[in-house]
Amino acid sequence: MENLRTPFSLISNALLARTEGLGFNATCRVYNITTRSLRSWEKRFGKLKGLLMTYALTHSFIKQVVEGDELYTKVRSNVPQEDSQGWTILLIERASRFIWALDCGKKDEELFMKAIKRLSEVIQSTSDLSLFTDGERRYGNKLFQLCHESLKTGKPGRPKKVLKKDIKVRVKNKGSQSHKPGRKRPKYQAPQSEHPLTKQDISDHNINANHAEAFNASLRRRNSAYRRKTNTYAKLTEALQRTLDVYWVVHNFIRQHYTTKRVPAENLGIIEKGLSFFDLLNRVR
């Protein structure tokens, strides 16, 4: 935040208001600042995401349970959902509530691969990782493309491809298929073959994305672009991603979660104590 003459207190208050649900123009009116200044502060603060993510990935984790889900909003105009640029992918660690991925764009392979590539980096530093998704099979399929290995058993023929050891993926199949003829899908399913030495210690009642759903509801309250009762949701995809980057930093490193009473990065063991806006704006170099 070098070369800025604005007091840190004003910048932090404005950014905090943005992450508590105040709209962009409303924040400018309340704090008597220009739209150019607020946009610049959000861009600069959001750039800390890359630095903090790199720092988080340098740590080693014994076990993680990650939930995946999607969130939808409109961008610029009202278009069919499949054409919207406002789809947001979330990957959140269940126990600590640490967000590993929070990216928006069109719901296509590029957006999914961006989130799964980040998850593959997390896998490299985690001894045992479980991924739960609520009805979206592409998470497991894309992860299989990046994190698979050939299972050599000594038998003739091509080795079978399986997920790497200690990686578990479960999908909760949505909807009832009792009215459809043919073979019925199981309620809980592994979309791809897993390593035979992977410990299968997942019970059925743990296969859910409830924490991700709760976060989605919270994000609709704390990010004005996701509210359902507004006429215009977000002007540009880049602007929507800018607000998500700011929210990612505040959620993971500044704001205490109301259930754990600790900052998610502190709860996951990345930092010893939660940070403040002053710490991030003044001391990170």
Predicted regions and their residues:
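A short acidic (Asp/Glu
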Residues: 77, 139-146
